[in-house]
Amino acid sequence: MPKPIVFVPGFPASELRDANGDTVFPPSPADLLVSTRKRAFLARMRKIPGDLVPGPPIRSVLGIAKQAQSLYDLLGHRGYQITGDGDGPDFRAVGWDWRLGVDEPHTIAAVADAVRSFAPRKVIFLIHSTGALVFRAFLAAHPELEASIDHVLAFGGAWCGTLEALFAVHRGHSESILGIKLLTEDEGADLIGHTQAAYDLFPPDAARTDLGEMQLVHGADGKPASPNVDLSWIKPDRLVYAKPLADSANERLGKRDREFGSLPMTNVVGWGGPTWPAALLVKNDVVFPAEDKDFGDGTVPWASASWIQGPNVRTLFIPIGAFVADPIPDLHAHMWESLAVTQILKEVLENAPRTPLVAAAADSDEAIDIDSEFVTIRLTAQSTDGKPLPDCVALAKVGGTPIPVPFNGSTRKILRLRRAGFHHNASNDVFRFTIDFHWTGGSHLNFGVSFRAV
């Protein structure tokens, strides 16, 4: 019998439905292509909570772009039966209204009910992204249910915030399909800018929280800042709705504790996807530098995802990029699909013995761009408890003499290869080589890496 799982998705990854059970979010293309319907949709979304209630996690968009369905497929191969709304004999999915706060009482009650539904069996919490903040709010509200939790498996947890939320609120993302723009940047910013959970995702108050390496936001004076404390960046016409949301987020979540407690957790952190590395708050604006792949998983900075700590917290870094058997990068939304995660799922869900985690992936863009001067290889090597492997050295066998990459007490390393001089050896346009990992007491040999070459 599979271990029971309670799944808490991220933001904005839950459906919103009306009183008839019809899905309002995500909207259909027709809802956004017709101007009158678009205005009605946006107005309805801004009326919070209005007549909308949370539905299940979004399985897919238009039946094409998999969301939670990609996770459900993986769990299905491991014996889990999951219905259309995300329930099953050993599985409960808790959709939540992401327009409200991460600690909204109805959401927390739904999480608690999901745990109780499996009693006396202990549950595994599978949490993704903003779901980490929902989970912490649940623990604070229901400490009596901590004994009902067997393990926490987190993917890309936004434990200490993310700049992606700040970008979405301030500048906004546009949405299009087949080249037809459905939402403009301003419409996207207006939609997300009215949601409390977006402000809950801003990095917290540096004066009240031990940010560690999370010094992502600075004010005009150059000092660490929180967008929920320094409100100078908010555009004047947005202040009427943005200030109350920022004030609420700061009051509730401005002070955060890095200590997770004694619960056992496997905390999966990705790096290798374009992620905002910093933000500068100036008058009525936010300055973002270029996205950087070495800062996170494409949405959440690794410094935030790895910020949480505790005596039983095992933090595992996985490189995001092109693997030999899986060249499509598994960014933030689909981290569980990474080949590097297969071992983790077996350990947590199937009680497989823990073994050291080693992995290497080529940068997904450089791996296929024949004109790029370099190919970046991201490597990770960690012991069974997530700590660095002792005296670990990776030997990249790319020529007559292997290239050593010493980890020097770290869990992550980067190898950059100049593309010139490499010629295809695995197919008509692919160069393949292997990496041997050696450490005190063990080794992992012939880890394959590949990229395009002439």
Task: Annotate each PLM feature.
Residues 151-154, 158-234, 266-267:
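Extended catalytic-interface subdomain
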Residues 89-92, 96-102, 199-289:
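Alpha/beta-hydrolase fold catalytic core
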Residues 131-133, 243-248, 294:
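A short linear-motif detector with a strong N-terminal bias
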